[in-house]
């Protein structure tokens, strides 16, 4: 830094002389001897001994330009005239430009040797190797002699030099997260570089180590939590633990539809995870009514499975109560509908017979329905008369057949007298006027009424 300050002050002095004196006359540039080579002076510093100024010393410790002895560059005697001062200023400016060029290339080489693009272990090894040997100087013959550099070109050279120094300062400050550590000495000898494969492998290992340490400082765990049950690779970061194994969250998938199951419920079948949809669709029993998978409660009846809301009467759709259900051809019915549809019918009321019944006339009857079909009177003594398939009492039976006595209205079961299209008991076939029996079989008829001969003549003469 002291040399750079000296260069800047000399340049300012030369510029001020040129501005005061005007345009000088042209003169051939003086042949100058090249500046002495720069030597590399390694500096071993310790974090404990370096204080607040240790960082600045460490920044610029690698480039040290020795001051040239006074005998090599003698001081020119002062000129009395303005042309002499101007010529001396141009010579001094040429010398400064040559020194700037040599310094720029040497500083650039030094920076690139210490901070390569990889910024990893390879760069550190090269820096350690550079401590054991001096930097190769660039001969002055390789650089063409500058032809009349102006103040503007010198300023541009200084700008490029300052930019290089700024990059050097930024790169040197980036990895400094703690106290400066002494550089590790590389065991490789000069002239025997390591193979590229080993260098790349070491750089990759160093990069992974730095990445893991950085994640650890940020609170992110980097230790492997086991092998993934799907890809069989180590797990670092988030992990899903299920089925006795660890999984990457993106690898814990449904075996059926391949959707991610992390953070959601799942079912296990034969050691494989399934989402609820795939599990119920593949392995749940089917409802006997809607043929859909049963997910929750289930009713088992008639050799199949049912949703509770679907196990109901197939006729009325009502759920079964405490009275249970009846089965017909594999289908459940409530008691009312089953009896209504399939119970035997009463011949009298055509209703289903639920309890006691009477079997008569090749049919079934409710006890209350087995009565005379004319007067609806129950049969006394359990006896009845049948006419045209209908149960009748005795009176209505004879009435239907015409075997009732026309006088008393009672059935004629024994001897009878048939006259006037009717039947009579023998004792009840009498004259309508005198009421004497007409036993002789001779009588007269008037208005469908029988009369004896004397009464008929007396009345109707």
UniProtKB/Swiss-Prot annotation:
Phosphothreonine: residues bearing it: 33, 188, 407
InterPro entries: Paxillin_TGFB1I1_LIM_dom1 (IPR047075), PDZ-LIM_domain (IPR050604), Tgfb1i1/Leupaxin/TGFB1I1 (IPR017305), Znf_LIM (IPR001781)
Chain positions of motif LD motif 1: 3-15
Transmembrane domains' residue ranges: none
Cystine crosslinks: none
PTM sites of type Phosphotyrosine: 38, 60
Tissue expression from the record: Strongly expressed in large intestine, lung, spleen, testis, uterus and to a lower extent in brain, kidney and liver (at protein level). In brain, expressed by neuronal and non neuronal cells (at protein level).
Modified residue annotations for Phosphoserine: 68, 140-141, 164, 186, 194, 403
CDD domains in UniProt: LIM1_Paxillin_like, LIM2_Paxillin_like, LIM3_Paxillin, LIM4_Leupaxin
Spans annotated as Interaction with PTK2B/PYK2: 1-240
Residues bearing PTM N-acetylmethionine: 1
Motif residue range(s): LD motif 4: 203-215
GO molecular function, one term: Roundabout binding
Family: Belongs to the paxillin family.
PANTHER family for the chain: LEUPAXIN, PDZ AND LIM DOMAIN PROTEIN ZASP
Its biological purpose: Functions as a molecular adapter coordinating multiple protein-protein interactions at the focal adhesion complex and in the nucleus. Links various intracellular signaling modules to plasma membrane receptors and regulates the Wnt and TGFB signaling pathways. May also regulate SLC6A3 and SLC6A4 targeting to the plasma membrane hence regulating their activity. In the nucleus, functions as a nuclear receptor coactivator regulating glucocorticoid, androgen, mineralocorticoid and progesterone receptor transcriptional activity.
Full protein name: Transforming growth factor beta-1-induced transcript 1 protein
Species: Rattus norvegicus
């Amino acid at each position: 830094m002291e040399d750079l300050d000296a260069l800047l002050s000399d340049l300012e002095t030369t510029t001020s002389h040129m501005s005061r004196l005007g345009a000088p006359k042209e003169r051939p540039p003086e042949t100058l001897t090249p500046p002495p080579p720069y030597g590399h002076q390694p500096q071993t510093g310790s974090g404990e001994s370096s204080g607040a100024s240790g960082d600045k010393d460490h920044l610029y410790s690698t480039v040290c330009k020795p001051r040239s002895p006074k005998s090599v560059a003698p001081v020119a005697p002062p000129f009395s005239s303005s042309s002499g001062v101007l010529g001396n200023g141009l010579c001094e400016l040429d010398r400064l430009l040559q020194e700037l060029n040599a310094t720029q290339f040497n500083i650039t080489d030094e920076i690139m040797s210490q901070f390569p693009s990889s910024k990893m272990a390879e760069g550190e090894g090269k820096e350690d190797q550079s401590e054991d040997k001096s930097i190769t100087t660039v001969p002055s013959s390789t650089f063409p002699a500058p032809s009349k550099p102006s103040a503007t070109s010198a300023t541009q050279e200084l700008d490029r030099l300052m930019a290089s120094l700024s990059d050097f300062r930024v790169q040197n400050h980036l990895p400094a997260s703690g106290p400066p550590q002494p550089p590790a000495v590389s065991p490789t000898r000069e002239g025997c570089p390591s193979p590229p494969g080993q260098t790349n492998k070491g750089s990759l290992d160093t990069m992974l180590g730095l990445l893991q340490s950085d994640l650890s400082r940020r609170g992110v765990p980097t230790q492997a939590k086991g092998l993934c049950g799907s890809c069989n690779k180590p797990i670092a970061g988030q992990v899903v633990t299920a089925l006795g194994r660890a999984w990457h969250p993106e690898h814990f998938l449904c075996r059926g539809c391949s959707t991610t199951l992390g953070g959601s419920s799942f079912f296990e079948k034969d050691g494989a995870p399934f989402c609820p949809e795939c599990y119920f669709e593949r392995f749940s029993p089917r409802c006997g009514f809607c043929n859909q998978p049963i997910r929750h409660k289930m009713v088992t009846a008639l050799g199949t499975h049912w949703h509770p809301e679907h196990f109901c009467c197939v006729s009325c759709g009502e759920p079964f109560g405490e009275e249970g259900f009846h089965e017909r051809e594999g289908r459940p019915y409530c008691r009312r509908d089953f009896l209504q549809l399939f119970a035997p019918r009463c011949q009298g009321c055509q209703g289903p017979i639920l309890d006691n019944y009477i079997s008569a006339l090749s049919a079934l009857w409710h006890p209350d329905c087995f009565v005379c079909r004319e007067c609806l009177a129950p049969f006394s003594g359990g006896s009845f008369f049948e006419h045209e398939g209908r149960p009748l009492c005795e009176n209505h039976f004879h009435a239907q057949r015409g075997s009732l006595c026309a006088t008393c209205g009672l059935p004629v079961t024994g001897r009878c007298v048939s006259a006037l299209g009717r039947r009579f008991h023998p004792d009840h076939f009498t004259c309508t006027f005198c009421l004497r029996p007409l036993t002789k079989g001779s009588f007269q008829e008037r208005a469908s009424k029988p009369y004896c001969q004397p009464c008929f003549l007396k009345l109707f003469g």
